[in-house]
Amino acid sequence: MQEAAAEKALVLCSGGADSSTLLAMAVEKYGPENVFALSISYGQKHSREIQSAAAVAEHYGVEQRFLDLAAIFAESDCSLLEHSEREVPCESYAEQLEEAGGAPVSTYVPFRNGLFLSSAASMALSLGCSVMFYGAHHDEWAGNAYPDCSPEFVQAMASAIEQGTGGQLRMEAPFVAWNKAQIVKRGLELGVPYELTWSCYEGGERPCGVCGTCRDRIAAFDANGVVDPLMR
C-alpha cells in the first residue's frame, strides 16, 4: 500500500514572538520539511521584523515565502505605515483603548489580517498545504483593539477559507484564547530563539522598550520570570 503523503502546513510569520512560537509548534508537529513560513510586507515603517522572520525561518530550516501588499494600504493613515505622519503610540493596548473610547487603536491597519489570511490561503493551497496557522491572541482583540484578531473574526475566516477551498484547507488559530505571557511560556518550553525575533514598532538595532508592543512583550517575559533576551 502506498504511504499517505505527509500533511503540509503554512504559518503566517511576522518575525515577532507570537508567530515565531507558532512556527516552532508547527515544526514540532509536522517537521521542518513540511512547513512553509509566509511573511508579508504591508508598508510598515521599517523592515526589521521581516529580517527577523527570515532569521527565524532559517533557524528552523523551513521554506519561506514573501508577499508585498503595501499598495493596498496606501490610502490608510495608520501610524504603523511609512507614509503616515502620525506618531506610533507608547501606551499599552489597555491605555490606548481607554483613550480611543473602545474604537480600534491607531496601530490597527484596516482589515489587514483579513487580507493576509486570504492571501495566505491562496498560497497555502498552491503549495499543497492542508492547514494554515494564524497567531492572533487574546491581548490583541480584548476591548476591540484589533477587531480582525477576535474569536468571531477567526471563526468567520476559518469558515470562509474552508468553504472557499472546497474543504481542502483549514485555518487554525491556537492562541486566540491565550495571552502573550502564555505564548511566551510555551515558546520557552520549545526553546524558541526569541533573540532572533522582533516586536518593536521602531526599527533600530535594539528595541525602544517604551512603545506599546515593547511594553507588552517585556511584561510577558517578566510574567515567566525571565528577561526578554532583546533587552539584556
Features from the language model and the residues they span:
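Short cysteine/histidine-rich metal-coordination sites, predominantly Zn2+-binding motifs
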Residues: G203-G204, N224-R232
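Local cysteine-cluster metal-coordination motifs and their immediate loop/turn environment
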Residues: S118, W198-A219
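Short amphipathic alpha-helical interaction/hinge segments
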Residues: T165, D222-G225
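Residue-level recognition of conserved structural "scaffold" positions that shape functional pockets
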Residues: L22-L23, D216, R232
